[in-house]
Structures are given as C-alpha cells and as structure tokens.
C-alpha cells in the first residue's frame, strides 16, 4: 500500500484499456475509400480466396476490410462503410465492410440473415 506522500509525489495512473479496432476512433462505423480490392488466402487449415479491400479512412488510417457475402461490386475508389469485427483466419484483417451502405451493394438473392448483408425482403 502506498503512503500519502508517495501518492502526492506520483499519483496512481488510470488503467488504459486496449481496443481491438483502433482505426474506428471509438465510433461504430467509419467511411473510407477503397485503394485496392483483391483476394487473399486464409491461414492453415482453411483454404479459400477471401475477398478483402484496402481502405483509406476519413481519419487518415489505412486498414484492410473483409467483404462478406457472395459476390460484390467494389473496385478502386469505391466509397464504403466499415465496422469492427476481425476475420479469424486472415491475419491483419480486423474490420468488416458494411454491405448495402454507400457504394457497396447488398447481396442479391439472399433469403436468410438478410440484415447482415444489406438484402431487401423478397416479394413473397
């Protein structure tokens, strides 16, 4: 236990909590411009071509964002919205692209879990 004099000389430092999504600046989403859209391969033991985009955010950060769902319409200079959420088998990918927002179209023909992919309700 510290004495009063010790605390006067050097006060207690507040706890600093580390964030998993530093580029969001404590915001729920951020807007950015795609600088590169490409596919990459996951870690062992998985095998696929995962679609990702390199994004320059409005706050100056440059991050890699995963593009979920089947098919997408993104290309260089597309303006997209990103949210937090890492992809476990892609090292360095800590953000997800929000489908159906800004320049990113929703997943067409999506029937279940539509809200996560920006898909409208089908006409019965």
Swiss-Prot record:
InterPro entries: NA-bd_OB-fold, Ribosomal_uS12, Ribosomal_uS12_bac. GO terms for cellular component: small ribosomal subunit. One of its GO terms (biological process) is translation. One of its GO terms (molecular function) is rRNA binding. Gene3D superfamilies: Nucleic acid-binding proteins. The keyword Nuclease does not apply. Keywords: Methylation, Ribonucleoprotein, Ribosomal protein, RNA-binding, rRNA-binding, tRNA-binding. The modification 3-methylthioaspartic acid is found at residue 89. It comes from the Bacteria. Pfam families: Ribosom_S12_S23 (PF00164). PANTHER family: 30S RIBOSOMAL PROTEIN S12 FAMILY MEMBER (PTHR11652). Belongs to the universal ribosomal protein uS12 family. Part of the 30S ribosomal subunit. Contacts proteins S8 and S17. May interact with IF1 in the 30S initiation complex. With S4 and S5 plays an important role in translational accuracy. Interacts with and stabilizes bases of the 16S rRNA that are involved in tRNA selection in the A site and with the mRNA backbone. Located at the interface of the 30S and 50S subunits, it traverses the body of the 30S subunit contacting proteins on the other side and probably holding the rRNA structure together. The combined cluster of proteins S8, S12 and S17 appears to hold together the shoulder and platform of the 30S subunit. This is Small ribosomal subunit protein uS12.
């Amino acid at each position: 236990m510290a004495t009063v004099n010790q605390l006067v000389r050097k006060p207690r430092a507040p706890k600093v909590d580390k964030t998993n999504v530093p580029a969001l600046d404590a915001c729920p989403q951020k807007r950015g411009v795609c600088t590169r859209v490409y596919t990459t391969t996951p870690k062992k033991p998985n095998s696929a071509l995962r679609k990702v985009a390199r994004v320059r955010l409005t706050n100056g950060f440059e991050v890699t964002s995963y593009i979920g769902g089947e098919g997408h319409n993104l290309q260089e200079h597309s303006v997209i919205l990103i949210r937090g959420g890492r992809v476990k088998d892609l090292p360095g990918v800590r953000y997800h692209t929000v489908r159906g927002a800004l320049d990113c179209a929703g997943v067409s023909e999506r029937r279940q879990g539509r809200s996560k992919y920006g898909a409208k309700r089908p006409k019965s």
